[in-house]
Amino acid sequence: MSIPKIVHFLWMSKEKDEKTLQCLASWKKHLVGYEIREWNSETFPYNDFIWTKEATEAKKWAFVTDYFRLWVLYNYGGIYMDADVLLQKNFDGLLDCNFFAGTEFTQQIGAHCMGSVAGHPYVKRCLDFYENRSFKTVMDNKALQEYAIPRIMTYILSIDYNVKTIRNFNNEPLKIDDGILIYSDNLFTIDICDNKNVGIHLGLGSWRDSTTFANPVYMENLEWYFIKRYYQHELQNMFSNRLKRMLYMISPIFLIVLYFKYKSRIKNIPTIMNVKNLIIKK
């Protein structure tokens, strides 16, 4: 089996901002021969599910999307992307599997860009997490961070497929049962100038509360920003990728970013125990 060339995204609010429009324009540029399917409040039956109904009432669109991305991949197959992913390549070389996703630097599944055949068992297990679960209760308990979808998907992968870690890729994706491939963060999250990046996650999500916890995607993009700006385009053509990375690693910028990465990881990386408790409790 292979993943169909259908790209799904959900837009529940009204007007799209300029950055979102730029991202969608990059999809049209690179995804020639793909169907790009925009879903909205009329085409996605959000009122049929407790989680999405209550999240919509609270106008927490990202948490509506958490359910949607699993629902649409399980029922239709294809590729799901957040609307704040800026594409640089197509997915042609990634479709010969049953499921793919990348990672975030916090060693969690990056749910902002993933593909699947319809009916995949891993997607179904993740979707089942939300069955009869109240978003309002989660929000009232101020527990939105604990219910971020990367945590849930990472935990279910670790339990159902006995995956101990999603790191140490050695330039190859992790190959897991049921045709699952997990890629490192340089494919779908950040661009580290290694010519492998498919898309950059800009991290424009509205669900984060910067006063209560750090934004790991922002930290990734901080690193990406300095890489691209620290090496002017003219200089990039003069040095090898290996040399550029070596220069970056000895620069003060690297040490600053490393510090903020550490602070973000402490606040955001889940433990097996706390996510297990979330799955057990309704």
Regions found by a protein language model. Give the residues of each.
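Glycosyltransferase-associated regions of secretory-pathway enzymes
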Residues: M1-T65, A83-K282
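Small-residue hinge/turn detector
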Residues: Y67-G78
